[in-house]
Amino acid sequence: MTTKLERLIDQGVGRIPADIVLKGGSFFDLVTGEIVRSDIAIGADRIVGTSGDYRGETEIDISGRTVVPGFIDTHLHIESSLVTPHEFDRCVLPYGVTTAICDPHEIANVLGTEGIEFFLESALETIMDIRVQLSSCVPATHLETAGADLPIERLLPFRDHPKVIGLAEFMNFPGVIHKDSVCMAKLDAFQGGHIDGHAPLLSGNDLNGYLSAGIRTEHECTSAAEALEKIRKGMHILVREGSVSKDLAALIPIITERLSPYLALCTDDRNPLDIAEQGHLDHMIRTAMASGVEPLAIYRAASISAARAFGLRDRGLVAPGWRADLVVLDSLQSCRAEMVFSAGRRVSDALFATRKPVAPIGLDSVKARPVNAAHFGVPVAEGETSVIGVMPGKIITEHRRYRLPAKGNETTVDLTNDIIKVAVIERHGKNGNHANGFVQGFGLKKGAIASTVGHDSHNICVVGVNEDDMAYAANRLGEIKGGFVVVEDGKITGEIALPVAGLMSIEPYETVRDTLHHLRQAALALGATLHEPFLQLAFLPLPVIPHLKISDRGMVDVDKFALIG
């Protein structure tokens, strides 16, 4: 009886036909930078031959096409696609993303270990290779109320799961630097494994201390200077381009052939509408090359460099013995996937149909107390008021200060300066907390927008001009079991239900995509000026990203890591 290994060797030598042979095309050699005209032979889940003439049980003509290794998204939260892992697989794999390294941080903050188990079970069924990093900071800080708590004792049972790739983004960098005991326990347990970083603007000796904990990758760089310091200190930089956080343009200067071994690509948070309109990592690759980046540099970052950064030694090259994750492109410059292979399987609707479904969880996670307009009042204060300053395309916000108008004994919105109200309402049934503040930069002239997607604890976050509309929008989220709601003059003008932990839809991604298009139009009707108002809203409660945020406990000065007043 011939073993699988013996069969692969025979196919590579050419003694027997390969399972699949891609004929007539070329491949991009990411070692030499050459375009090599060659057949590509596939046996089972791996490449068995290149630079030769092969016979195959199935032969596919790819004349005029160029093959590259499958793309690797090195850091993302699948929940931000607003669909389940199965639908994410079906949505993104056709764009050439054959490996996704995800942090189920969002669902873990709502449901704890049940959320991690859901992702691991899903990862065993998807066609795309989904790898899971264990969420390191649940809750992210003591400055908010999460639905769950994940001490090291609850993470350790998952550490050796075949789909687990290490410890996810360690956001509590002050806790690392100051040797917080909870942080130390988690870091100590994963020494020798992969620990993902999250340290925006951290520099100098503080960065040295953070890296001394064994942290090796970083996706929060927003400038070339920041990225270069971190590369010099041994980090791999994951260049990010999501629906909100758009750092690619700022990091173009570092995407060079010399630095490409220390670079990878990631999306972090990207919704189905943007994926449908622009693409996924393929969009990043096209954009980079249009900005003057050499193809060798960006394609390395998209595959082999990413694989090496995370210890995935079996993928990232078109070469014999390597995993057959392949993308057949019309050309390198256009980066349009015409055909995708995942572990030797040609991606198709029929292949997706073979997956075992995984039942949704967390369908009753929204337990917020009802609110009314009075809950959104802000008492008049002497002097200036702290205002969250939104920066389009960034999740970093500014700490701005304004003298705001008053009506009676309450501070009101200032539409002339684009300042409206923002509130966060605890929705896990823990304490009923409710905090109010002000935000600048949404462009709203009327109405309200509310969401149960609110990083990282995913309480209800609502922005608005009218307190009655804010209350209506917040209460409606409980009725639909989570999601996004747009209210204008007492009427719901757009909504999407996200009943899986208040984060993900149970509908196909096409339905979510189309509904998001309508939601954008509803937000624009309120005056919204942001490209992605819903995900921008979702980052207002994130107290680990500078400089000013809001949680269910109040306004947070992130630089001081403390509540304001």
UniProtKB/Swiss-Prot annotation:
Reaction equations catalysed: adenine + H2O + H(+) = hypoxanthine + NH4(+)
Cofactor or coenzyme needed: Mn(2+)
EC annotation from Swiss-Prot or TrEMBL: 3.5.4.2
Keywords: Hydrolase, Manganese
GO BP terms in the entry: adenine catabolic process
Pfam families reported for this sequence: Adenine_deam_C (PF13382), Amidohydro_1 (PF01979)
Alphabetized GO MF terms: adenine deaminase activity
Class in the EC hierarchy, top level: hydrolase
HAMAP family noted in UniProt: Adenine_deamin
Entry similarity comment: Belongs to the metallo-dependent hydrolases superfamily. Adenine deaminase family.
Protein name: Adenine deaminase 1
Organism: Rhizobium etli (strain ATCC 51251 / DSM 11541 / JCM 21823 / NBRC 15573 / CFN 42)
Lineage: Bacteria, Pseudomonadati, Pseudomonadota, Alphaproteobacteria, Hyphomicrobiales
Gene of this entry: ade1
